Amino acid sequence: MTTRTTRWIAVALLCLAAIAAHAQPRDDTLYRELGGEPGLVALMDDFMPRLLADARMHPFFKEVDQADLKAKLVTQFCQVSGGPCVLKETDMRKKHDGFDISRGDFNRLVEVLQQSMDARGIPFAAQNRLLAKLAPMHREIVNVP
């Protein structure tokens, strides 16, 4: 190798090292405010029975595998809140196809989630940040006017 090539390689490696050294860590503040994974499991322990008890929500969830849904929601909330989880199934439109979910249905689910977050003592600011991260999903979930 020529001296010039060696210098370019050295400069490139130094640049890569500098970029790696300045990489921003994942912001897991919201995840921690929600109590981490144990807090999310506790939230779902409160949320799932409320969904089933709610007259408007019950038809959507009565035939769903509750344990599987709970695990997926914990993973989803973990991921969107900055936790270490990765949701493998991301096609929300496909998952909700055939359920005839209106904007009112979606909003009711959010209300039930807020009740659970209140019951768990999750600070209002953390609730708002979580809901802001989840809100864009309505475009893939709501499938009837």
Question: Where do the PLM segments sit?
Answer:
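Bacterial N-terminal signal peptides that target proteins for export
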Residues: M1-A12
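Acidic/proline-rich low-complexity IDRs
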Residues: A12-C15, F47
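Hydrophobic h-region of N-terminal signal peptides that target proteins for export
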Residues: L14-H22
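Core of compact, soluble alpha-helical bundle domains
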Residues: A23-P145
